[in-house]
């Protein structure tokens, strides 16, 4: 993938003039691509009365690569505040992580709920 592409503009086609560099009236300008950062999405875990705290910590370690200490802090935030952000990702990654967590929770017969929200 090239960082720049070339745009050719032709002037005075009816009256060609000679140029020192033999460009025949063709101007070349670098087109700079305009890139924007993709919108980010929060992956949010919600508290429930049935999912064990150890299971929530396991989910945070496995699916969000948090260490034990940080996973425990996030789990306590879920428990005390009713919800907590597990990570900030692009939409595709956030949707995939939320789906994986929800699927794993169902397979483990826990009602843990994970959703995504647009950041900002």
UniProtKB/Swiss-Prot annotation:
InterPro entries: ClpS, ClpS_core, Ribosomal_bL12_C/ClpS-like
Descriptive protein name: ATP-dependent Clp protease adapter protein ClpS
Pfam families: ClpS (PF02617)
Organism whose genome encodes this protein: Pseudomonas syringae pv. syringae (strain B728a)
HAMAP family to which the protein is assigned, alphabetical: ClpS
Gene3D superfamilies reported for this sequence: 3.30.1390.10
Function noted in UniProt: Involved in the modulation of the specificity of the ClpAP-mediated ATP-dependent protein degradation.
Family to which this protein belongs: Belongs to the ClpS family.
Oligomeric form and interacting partners: Binds to the N-terminal domain of the chaperone ClpA.
Domain of life: Bacteria
């Amino acid at each position: 993938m090239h960082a720049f592409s070339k745009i050719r503009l032709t002037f005075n086609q009816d009256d060609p003039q000679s140029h020192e560099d033999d460009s025949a009236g063709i101007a070349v300008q670098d087109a700079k691509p305009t890139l924007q950062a993709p919108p980010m999405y929060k992956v949010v875990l919600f508290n429930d009365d049935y999912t064990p705290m150890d299971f929530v910590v396991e989910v945070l370690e496995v699916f969000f690569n948090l260490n034990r200490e940080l996973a425990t802090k996030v789990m306590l935030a879920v428990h005390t505040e009713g919800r907590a952000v597990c990570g900030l990702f692009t939409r595709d990654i956030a949707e995939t992580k939320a789906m994986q967590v929800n699927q794993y929770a169902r397979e483990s017969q826990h009602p843990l709920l994970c959703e995504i929200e647009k950041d900002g």
